[in-house]
């Protein structure tokens, strides 16, 4: 499940960048198609993340539970910011504050996911 979650995140970030570039170039129709595919990836990301969070709750108990829940909330925050940035770009609205939130959420997710929680790089 961990590999599926990381793969879906990687594909999600790639599709996010492609959609951003297309919106900036003014290719609205292809950008909307990529955006819809990205929304399907969001569903996969949320489902696999929920399963991983449930595994943490069941298997590791209280010492790690707080960090697992913060990572889950930061992951949801990151998905929400990706969606809001793309929607703002499509409508031509400023997205500076959303980019700041995206950066903070991304750092939280990477640090907690890869370096603090079990199943990350430090626990292999």
From Swiss-Prot:
It holds the Pfam family DUF1516. Keywords: Cell membrane, Membrane, Transmembrane, Transmembrane helix. One of its GO terms (cellular component) is plasma membrane. The chain crosses the membrane at residues 3-23, 33-53, 62-82, 104-124. It is a multi-pass membrane protein. InterPro entries: UPF0344 (IPR010899). It is found in: Cell membrane. HAMAP family: UPF0344 (MF_01536). Belongs to the UPF0344 family. This is UPF0344 protein OB1184.
